[in-house]
Curated annotation (Swiss-Prot):
Tagged with keyword Ligase: yes
Organism name: Hyphomonas neptunium (strain ATCC 15444)
InterPro entries, alphabetized: SAICAR_synt/ADE2_N, SAICAR_synt_PurC, SAICAR_synth, SAICAR_synthetase, SAICAR_synthetase_CS
Similarity comment text for this entry: Belongs to the SAICAR synthetase family.
Pathway, per record: Purine metabolism; IMP biosynthesis via de novo pathway; 5-amino-1-(5-phospho-D-ribosyl)imidazole-4-carboxamide from 5-amino-1-(5-phospho-D-ribosyl)imidazole-4-carboxylate: step 1/2
Enzyme Commission identifier(s): 6.3.2.6
Protein name per the record: Phosphoribosylaminoimidazole-succinocarboxamide synthase
NCBIfam families: purC
Length: 259
């Protein structure tokens, strides 16, 4: 068997060379990290769930006109994606105060924000992904002025769609992190900005609309337990998997309790 060529390996995913020019295979690992990878664990079945959830959301975003790198799911852990040149920025959209926003500004966790906030962080693990401004982005050439405007517009469109999607499933979209890349279609000189990476409970804060229970990676960060179970509950509410947990024997019903 020919060994696939690894293009990039991150904390939660591996990118392999794709079967066709301009494509990659994105593999979702069970590895879970927090606090700049100082906290680590392997959670059985997490990669399967993130693959399915990200596929579901990216497919729906395509249907509402948000261009992204997703092509199709290949199997339980892999999907075929377009190869893009990643812009070295993490884009965070916030609807409710939580995480670093509460810490930095002293805003109580759970307070609704007057409007969605879009923040940018420079992708650099060694520097702990520092927050940057539009001036930094322009000065260091991380994105052009037009790309910056496109990213803001796309991020807010993603937020509008996902807020409604999750609200229909009884979930509040607190905030989320996304990434974008430049896609050179047919070797054209002008690249197109595409949503890339993934959208899953690893990259979103999701709270139960009635109880406020956390259904995302904060369960791992805060040692609450039930991480995979919470991700499975998100998938069930979105209609991705059946109540029985068809994708993995490691997925069981999420009760909201700690373990």
């Amino acid at each position: 068997m020919n060994k696939r060529r690894v293009i990039y390996e991150g904390k939660a995913k591996i990118l392999y060379e794709g079967p066709e020019p301009g494509t990659l295979i994105q593999y979702f690992k069970d590895d879970t990290t927090a606090f700049d990878a100082t906290k680590k664990a392997v959670l059985d079945g997490k990669g399967v769930l993130n693959n399915r959830i990200s596929e579901f959301i990216m497919t729906h975003l395509t249907s509402v006109g948000v261009p992204n790198h997703f092509i199709r799911r290949l199997n339980m852990r892999e999907q075929l994606v377009r190869k893009v040149d990643i812009i070295p920025l993490e884009v965070v959209v916030r609807n409710i105060a939580a995480g670093s926003l509460s810490t930095r500004l002293g805003i109580p966790e759970g307070q609704s924000l007057p409007r969605p906030l879009v923040e940018f962080y420079f992708k650099n693990d060694a520097l702990h992904d520092p927050m940057v401004s539009e001036e930094h982005i322009a000065a260091f050439g991380w994105a052009t002025a037009q790309e910056y405007d496109d990213i803001i517009a796309l991020a807010l469109r993603v937020n509008d769609f996902m807020s409604g999607l999750f609200a229909g499933a009884g979930i509040r979209l607190v905030d989320f992190k996304i990434e974008f890349g430049r896609w050179f279609e047919n070797d054209h000189d002008m690249p197109r900005i595409l949503l890339a990476d993934e959208i899953s409970p690893d990259s979103c804060r999701l709270w139960d609309a009635k109880t406020g229970e956390k259904m995302d990676k904060d369960r791992f960060r805060r040692d609450m337990g039930g991480v995979t179970e919470a991700y499975a509950e998100v998938a069930r509410r979105l209609g991705i998997i059946r109540e029985s947990g068809e994708e993995t024997d490691n997925v069981i019903h999420f009760t909201g309790g700690s373990k």
